[in-house]
A protein has these predicted regions:
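Acidic/His- and Gly-rich active-site-bordering loop/insert found
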Residues: 1-127
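Acidic/histidine-rich catalytic neighborhood of metal-dependent amide-processing enzymes
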Residues: 121-203
Length: 203
């Protein structure tokens, strides 16, 4: 499965979080994506894959031979999306070979153009995935999840040497609780990167 198909699959699974909830995760729907990722991580070949009672998803890539003493790196992304716009039926729209014109968002009457979003100018000729205008897309942060999952798949399939890698997908980041119950002893990384950016090339 390529990164685009992964993202499209994840985007259609509704995972809105709920402000003011007293439990974690704040919505049970986040478990739907968590268990989907759990299954895929096992299929890819990650080890010690786990979804805990608070909807934190863990998985690990052991170091390849000769790289056991490298620093232990972690990658984190979040399962939830904002829940204050539109319905739960998220319908991604794929625009191939972008030509620079305004992109109509389905039949919603909304559109994206380079005046509002100047970085679209850097996407000429590329494939762009948008919402249909009736919901959020959820690229924050399902794009990050797709990137991390594809990285893991590529490292395993292409037998690319690497040190030990920890993966964690967290719930409730959009309401400020993403790292609240992350088990640092289990995650056990020397350094970690949160994959949750904006424009291409941003660090």
């Amino acid at each position: 499965m390529d990164i685009k198909q992964r993202f499209l699959n994840y985007a259609t699974i509704y995972t809105g979080s709920s402000e003011g909830s007293s439990v974690t995760p704040s919505t049970k729907e986040q478990f739907n994506l968590a268990h989907e990722l759990e299954q895929e991580m096992n299929e890819i070949g990650l080890s010690d894959v786990l979804v805990d009672e608070n909807c934190y998803v863990y998985g690990f890539l052991p170091a390849t031979k000769g790289y056991e003493n490298c620093k232990h790196i972690g990658f984190i992304a979040h399962l939830d999306i904002v829940s204050d716009f539109g319905t739960r039926e998220i319908k991604p729209q794929v625009v191939k070979d972008y030509n620079g014109n305004a992109i109509s968002l389905g039949t919603s009457g909304r559109f994206l153009d380079t005046e509002q979003f100047p970085h679209l100018k850097n996407a000429l000729g590329k494939t762009i995935i948008t919402t249909d205008g009736n919901t959020v897309l959820g690229a924050d942060d399902k794009a990050g999840i797709a990137e991390i999952m594809t990285m893991c798949s590529e490292l395993i399939e292409k037998q690319i040497p690497h040190g030990k890698i920890s993966i964690c997908f967290t719930p409730d980041e959009e309401i400020g609780h993403g790292a609240a119950l992350l088990d640092l002893d289990k995650f056990d990384a020397d350094y970690a990167f949160t994959v949750d950016g904006s424009s291409p090339g941003e660090i």
